[in-house]
Amino acid sequence: MARCSVLYFILLSALINKGQACFCDHYPWTQWTSCSKTCNSGTQSRHRQIVVDKYYQENFCEQICSKQETRECNWQRCPINCLLGDFGPWSDCDPCVEKQSKVRSVLRPSQFGGQPCTEPLVAFQPCIPSKLCKIEEADCKNKFRCDSGRCIARKLECNGENDCGDNSDERDCGRTKAVCTRKYDPIPSVQLMGSGFHFLAGEPRGEVLDNSFTGGICKTVKSSRTSNPYRVPANLENVGFEVQTAEDDLKTDFYKDLTSLGHNENQQGSFSSQGGSSFSVPIFYSSKRSENINHNSAFKQAIQASHKKDSSFIRIHKVMKVLNFTTKAKDLHLSDIFLKALNHLPLEYNSALYSRIFDDFGTHYFTSGSLGGVYDLLYQFSSEELKNSGLTEEEAKHCVRIETKKRVLFAKKTKVEHRCTTNKLSEKHEGSFIEGAEKSISLIRGGRSEYAAALAWEKGSSGLEEKTFSEWLESVKENPAVIDFELAPIVDLVRNIPCAVTKRNNLRKAFQEYAAKFDPCQCAPCPNNGRPTLSGTECLCVCQSGTYGENCERRSPDYKSNAVDGHWGCWSSWSTCDATYKRSRTRECNNPAPQRGGKHCEGEKRQEEDCTFSIMENNGQPCINDDEEMKEIDLPEIEADSGCPQPIPPENGFIRNEKKLYSVGEDVEILCLTGFETVGYQYFRCLPDGTWRQGDVECQRTECIKPVVQEVLTITPFQRLYRIGESIELTCPKGFVVAGPSRYTCQGNSWTPPISNSLTCEKDTLIKLKGHCQPGQKQSGSECICMYPEEDCSHYSEDLCVFDTDSNDYFTSPACKFLAEKCLNNQQLHFLHIGSCQDGRQLEWGLERARFSSNSTKKESCGYDTCYDWEKCSASTSKCVCLLPPQCFKGGNQLYCVKMGSSTSEKTLNICEVGAIRCANRKMEILHPGKCLA
């Protein structure tokens, strides 16, 4: 039949070649049907309006013309609208700020063109407090107190300089003594060095350091551009002026897509210790180290440009420095506005009020850096045109660099190489490689805005004037930006203010919650392995190379991959503080999970940190100052004429009626923490000589703490504490097995056997080998054959206690090896129990049962075991369960004469009844096989 079909099509082809071919457009198409979906890729079809006429039949139209066509439509993703939760209740009225707040969260960011959220997330209102404010004024001791509450050195009074910031140190001065012999100007733009920096948004924020404060020291620095020195502020360790304009420091970088440009795993260290989140922000490199830019502007613009077509990017950048600076490591002078904001923070933790610090002043401050400017452009090229140009990535970078030196820097002796003007891309644009770009995104920083704007490249523009770059460079000296900087957390600045320790702890807690709002774990997965990034309350998709479209849903012809890389879901809430003073949180690689060979998520699944819990009544946050950050037991001991100081409780114990001094004859009671119990006499008595009469007492653990295991493992039963003797079972997802023991028992104060932290799941190769075969067998084609212990049992399998009737000995064997040897007709091996062999009743009965089994007429396979006449196989547990004697069959050939308990009378029982009685551990003596003679 197939041969006839081939001959038919050969004949048809010959006829068509002679001119007898159907002109299919003679039969028009219908209109396309409406799309089957409004979004998320639907289909639509159309049909050819066929009329079976003479022309149709004579010209083979039936065989030549397609009758139906289908095409994809509405391939854009369905929009996801931003969704806000309801406001929670009003917080308690804070007595220090006389405000209360209520907050709501973003339940779902907008994505794929959905409606954004524009309503506020926090609401405040004034209130009348019912409690007193516990914040006390800072103790200035021997320093001068400003009207603002700030403490400054006494030597700064009446020196003619506004050191307090409110001029209160210069009030009522009879005579002033100047610090410097003449007046010096401040360093230009010195206030920029004291700005806060929002690491998560990549932009400077409000002033946190007062760099107008000189600290009563006349330290100056001189610039080569001016004859007059500048006054150095007290917050700066050193300052050095320089101007760098070398032509050879013009650098270029090539990016196949924006994922590598906006994501750098190695650049998250500045805040990873505060939350360990997986998110990152767009990072751009300068000459010294990586820096962030505002991902709500330039990076967002780059993402939107990449959606138009499959794109590659070439970035060219040059750093010009005016000066370098280093901030002092300690004793920094805060700005008045930042100090006022810190002083107005409540003592009780309030997420909304504490988070405003990061909104207003950023998350970090500059510890070192440079002032200057950065010439920085990101050129977008069509990936297809770059590929067709015939240039390599390195050659394309070189052409952009050479052309920039000639057209922007107007560098003399710059020779444009032949390959940069004669490739297929440059030839379309009169020899210009840069003109072949789709557009450019300006990342220029520093200098006057009109000069910076003039440096930006636009497609089809006539080019720059020769003075444009030099004018911008000159303006950088007067209008610099902070570049090439190092950062430290802004929380470190919260010192020497009232309740500094309490407020630092609250700010650290607020930062964890605040940083989570920037985590793209809240976004839905992007098509074609795109990487989601969160911009405010909107999720954007950063496309992989070879993909494009508003949400990366379109593919270039050569993009064939179907792999889906895994991305982290959001962190769970922190667990409660357990008896080991630890708490933990977890996350899953399921947004999405890796599929079809995609990469697994990088980073940790579980985080653990120290924590504390109180056994006393919670009376609110205490006001702890920097000089009070010590425990009560560190305070000086109270001297008294009589009585006893507080005794030392045993480890994991505490004193019920705790105080510093006890009267003679007074008793104290020792209690133990949860999970421990007192062993011994738990009362101490104060003696007249100031010592304690006490017996031996200790706190012994009565429970085991839930073990820490890999997230892929499931603990059953799942609870925080387990009593002595309780067991847990570790299981894995379907298709995987525990790579070690799966059952553990709480014994004493630890788990037996010990649970390894590295214990995880592995692919269940035994199931794959086994196929549809019985235990101990493997699939070989369509047949089942016995496994070979040496070849097929190299992986982990649980331990079994096994009895060998040949050697009359028992030993521990891996389950796989035991089943394989049983399959190979090794009948002398008998299963005793799961787990390693241990002396006891279970082992005694197992040995007796194995010896007695040779006389059984029934041998039913059941899991690892074989059930005999006195047993049945449990379908739910795959274990042999002993029958009760009345459940045994009557009669039979296997009979025994026995004597029960202390009775002297003899009785004839069959093998089932004898086995059932011995299994129940009842006393019985077997006199001889066969019926009793009497």
From Swiss-Prot:
Residues 780-839, 876-934 form the Kazal-like domain. Residues 858-934 are annotated as: Factor I module (FIM) 2. It is a multi-pass membrane protein. Disulfide bonds join 22-61, 24-65, 35-73, 39-78, 82-117, 93-127, 96-133, 140-151, 146-164, 158-173, 180-218, 399-420, 499-623, 521-570, 523-539, 526-541, 543-552, 577-611, 589-601, 644-686, 672-699, 704-746, 732-761, 773-823, 784-801, 786-837, 793-816, 862-873, 867-919, 880-897, 882-932, 888-912. Residues 176-522 form the MACPF domain. Glycans are attached at residues 29, 32, 38, 90, 324, 392, 568, 571, 574, 855. Residues 523-553 form the EGF-like domain. Residues 1-21 form the signal peptide. Keywords: Calcium, Complement pathway, Cytolysis, Disulfide bond, EGF-like domain, Glycoprotein, Immunity, Innate immunity, Membrane, Membrane attack complex, Metal-binding, Repeat, Secreted, Signal, Sushi, Target cell membrane, Target membrane, Transmembrane, Transmembrane beta strand. InterPro entries: C6_KAZAL, C8A_B_C6_EGF-like, FacI_MAC, Kazal_dom, LDL_receptor-like_sf, LDLR_class-A_CS, LDrepeatLR_classA_rpt, MAC_perforin. It is found in: Secreted; Target cell membrane. Residues 689-765 are annotated as: CCP 2. Residues 766-840 are annotated as: Factor I module (FIM) 1. Residues 22-79, 81-134, 565-612 form the TSP type-1 domain. All cysteine residues are assumed to be cross-linked to one another. Individual modules containing an even number of conserved cysteine residues are supposed to have disulfide linkages only within the same module. Residues 611-688 are annotated as: CCP 1. GO terms for biological process: complement activation, classical pathway; innate immune response; killing of cells of another organism. The chain crosses the membrane at residues 278-290, 402-415. Residues 138-175 form the LDL-receptor class A domain. Component of the membrane attack complex (MAC), a multiprotein complex activated by the complement cascade, which inserts into a target cell membrane and forms a pore, leading to target cell membrane rupture and cell lysis. The MAC is initiated by proteolytic cleavage of C5 into complement C5b in response to the classical, alternative, lectin and GZMK complement pathways. The complement pathways consist in a cascade of proteins that leads to phagocytosis and breakdown of pathogens and signaling that strengthens the adaptive immune system. Belongs to the complement C6/C7/C8/C9 family. Component of the membrane attack complex (MAC), composed of complement C5b, C6, C7, C8A, C8B, C8G and multiple copies of the pore-forming subunit C9. This is Complement component C6. It comes from Pongo pygmaeus.
